[in-house]
Amino acid sequence: MANPILEQAKENMEKAEASLRRTLGQIRAGRANASLVNRVNVEYYGAMTPLNQIAAITIPEARVLLITPYDKGALEDIEKALYTADIGISPANDGSVIRLVIPQLTGERRKEIAKEVGKEAELAKVVVRNARRDAMDNLKKAEKASEISEDEMHDLEEQVQNLTNEATKKIDAISKDKEKEITEG
């Protein structure tokens, strides 16, 4: 796969898959998961610092996330950052640690979250289709400019289509796994 058009298409499709994994990792499934607070930044000594750099994040129980700051003076800053991060869970500060108790999901809420997962998967598929379209357009331009032969173009188009099919299957699998996790939660 030495063709730069093909490599660019593959890279864009892999980015769509990685982005979907990150996004779905932040969707709560009724269980504690450290990824819920991955993107929380805390103002610590005047600088925005990722939460995981100033506190230990553990999961002592299935639905409890425990945040233990390395510096007890940062406790209130962490609590404030969790409130402003809008993660949908109110932090409980007991003076030395912060607990995030994930509420039990109702059947209706599970369905809503499963729909959200489906929407995110569809957005990832759109990115994959756009990468495919761009690659096909670039192949046609290269063929018109006599950079590649017609036979090479058809071979490369087939490879782009195979990459697209593979990326779509991966996205479907990721989506199905997350939906299963949510509905069985």
UniProtKB/Swiss-Prot annotation:
Query: What are the record keywords, sorted?
Result: Cytoplasm, Protein biosynthesis
User: Quick one: a GO cellular component term?
Assistant: cytoplasm
The record's region (Disordered) falls at 163-185
- What InterPro entries does the record point to? Ribosome_recyc_fac, Ribosome_recyc_fac_dom, RRF_sf
Parts of the chain that traverse the membrane: none
Q: Which GO terms describe its molecular function?
A: ribosomal large subunit binding
Name which cysteines form disulfide bonds: none
**Coiled-coil stretches, from where to where?**
none
Top-level division of the source organism's lineage: Bacteria
Q: Where in the cell is it found?
A: Cytoplasm
What segments bear the compositional bias annotation Basic and acidic residues?
167-185
Q: Name one GO biological process term.
A: translational termination
User: What does the protein in this record do?
Assistant: Responsible for the release of ribosomes from messenger RNA at the termination of protein biosynthesis. May increase the efficiency of translation by recycling ribosomes from one round of translation to another.
The UniProt entry's sequence similarity note says:
Belongs to the RRF family.
Protein's name according to its UniProt entry: Ribosome-recycling factor
- What is the name of the gene encoding this protein? frr
